[in-house]
Amino acid sequence: MNMAIIANGKIEKHARLRSIWANADARIAADGGAVNARQHLELAPHVLIGDLDSLDEATRRWCEQAQTEFLQHPRAKDQTDLELAIDLAIARGAKNISILGTLGGRFDQMLANVLLLIKPARANIPARIAGSDFDAWIATHSATITGNIGDTVSLIPLSERVEGIVTVNLKYPLHNETLYLGSARGVSNALTTIHAEVSFGRGLLMIVHLLESTEHS
């Protein structure tokens, strides 16, 4: 099942984001993410989860009219609203997860949001943070990157080391090499064809793909 999650971060009205949200088999809003859905994506979530402290009355009524399922948690909790949403997606059988609205606002929350991608990656569930002009995801062994020639691709280790990296169709190739946590060596590579491949033997590797300019609508 293809699931989309919307968080309470910065988001904009954009055809790409609306398409991801509309085409998901299940749509989950993490608390104030429902406000983002109402204001920018114009389609209600199937499920709203969190402590709901960021939910305004207009959005609450909008979700109720759409028969959204409400899963309210206490404000004093060990997980963020986005983590609750990711856990719910995994528990309900997600095969693919797209997460919107994770950036902007407090730096600590933004960083934590990005690192939450580790959880579905370890469960072998493909998950990405999707923006209007980028995708970011974590690979555990291999990845295919599809885009336009010249698109920027960055490879960022999230484990102490990522070993045995081999790339195909990137401008600066890696041949059975190691990237280390804290090194920026893998930043700002580029596609040389519309498809590139990355494989490695061990570690967690974040891949960030900056998309060619896309139109608002």
Task: Say what each PLM segment does.
Residues 119-135:
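Short, acidic/small-residue loops that bind anionic groups at enzyme active sites
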Residues 70-91:
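Short phosphate-binding loop-to-helix
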Residues 6, 28-31, 50, 71-72, ...:
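General beta-strand structural signal in soluble alpha/beta enzymes
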Residues 1-62:
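N-terminal beta-strand-loop-alpha-helix module at the start
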Residues 107-118:
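Short Gly/Thr/Asp-enriched flexible loops that form oxyanion-binding sites at enzyme active sites
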